[in-house]
Regions:
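Non-heme di-metal
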Residues: 1-282
Length: 282
């Protein structure tokens, strides 16, 4: 019987994102041995990355107009890059953090499989338009937060699924509207699949954040602002997809705080354009 955490580390090290997504999906939901206590040594060079896309600060990425083929494909590429990084993050949280309950690892393995599907759907759609993943520059925002939270599983689940990925719940409807407005109904269908699954992924983050807070004797709501400050998480700007956030397990108190004037200040890293929301959501 294969061991899940070592397998996820091996997959994370793969440089080819297409091969990585294929292998994650091929492993599937088979019976796994899970060594929850073993501290795995960290190899150099993770995550494995291809030579393309070129990585740069998101503020240096200048998307073309959406009504051009390059602008259309560029927006899809930005979302595809988010999903590629989401595969890496799900694999990383499994191998990196020992000592969690068995179900923690199985939950994130399910997330990894769904993120791999999302990446594949978007990559295939890009190819149908004459482009491919790697044809446009991309940023490292999601993995940068992973690096900052690499030593604390509480910070990781608080600030990746519950913060950056939850921003994807907010951005998804507007991105879908833009793509459908230029006639890309297939992209709209894919984004519907992603939104459905991402609600579940954020719910996994919420569930394990609450569990970890309970284990450490912390109040989840009171603890969160301190984590965002310590790890330099971006403040989020509305509009917020409150229905999706509620479905993902955010409490009524959290949703009310999210709508408070102090929580909707615009940080330098987020602007009001739909395309930039897609670029910076993760």
């Amino acid at each position: 019987m294969p061991e899940l955490r070592q397998t996820c580390l091996d997959l994370l090290c793969l440089a080819d994102p297409n091969d990585k997504a294929l292998q994650v999906q091929a492993w599937g939901a088979q019976p796994w041995a899970v060594d929850t206590e073993r501290a795995l040594p960290e190899p150099a060079g993770i995550p494995g990355r291809p030579l393309r896309p070129v990585l740069m600060a998101h503020t240096d990425i200048k998307p073309a107009r959406l009504t051009t083929p390059e602008g259309h494909a560029g927006l899809l590429h930005a979302v595809c890059h988010i999903e590629k990084n989401a595969v890496d993050l799900a694999l990383d949280v499994i191998w990196r953090f020992a000592g969690m309950p068995h179900d923690f690892y199985l939950d994130w393995w399910q997330v990894a499989q769904e993120e791999a599907l999302h990446y594949t759907l978007l990559r295939d759609h890009l190819r149908s338009l004459g482009f491919d993943y790697g044809d446009f520059p991309a940023h490292t925002g999601l993995w940068d937060m992973a690096e900052r939270t690499r030593h604390d599983v509480l910070a990781r689940v608080a600030l990746v699924p519950r913060t950056l990925e939850a921003r994807g719940l907010d951005a998804s409807p507007a991105v879908k509207t833009k793509l459908v407005s230029i006639g890309d109904h297939r992209a709209g269908e894919i984004l519907d699949i992603i939104l459905r699954d991402e609600i579940g992924h954020v719910a996994v983050g919420n569930r394990w954040y609450a569990w970890l807070c309970a284990q450490r004797g912390l109040d989840p709501v009171a603890t969160y602002p301190g984590l965002t400050q310590r790890y330099q998480a971006p403040r989020l700007k509305g509009p917020f997809n409150l229905a999706a956030r509620a479905a993902a397990g955010f409490t009524a108190q959290e949703l009310l705080q999210l709508q408070a004037p102090s929580s909707t200040s615009t940080p330098a890293s987020i602007n009001s354009s739909t395309q930039s929301a897609a670029l910076t959501a993760h």
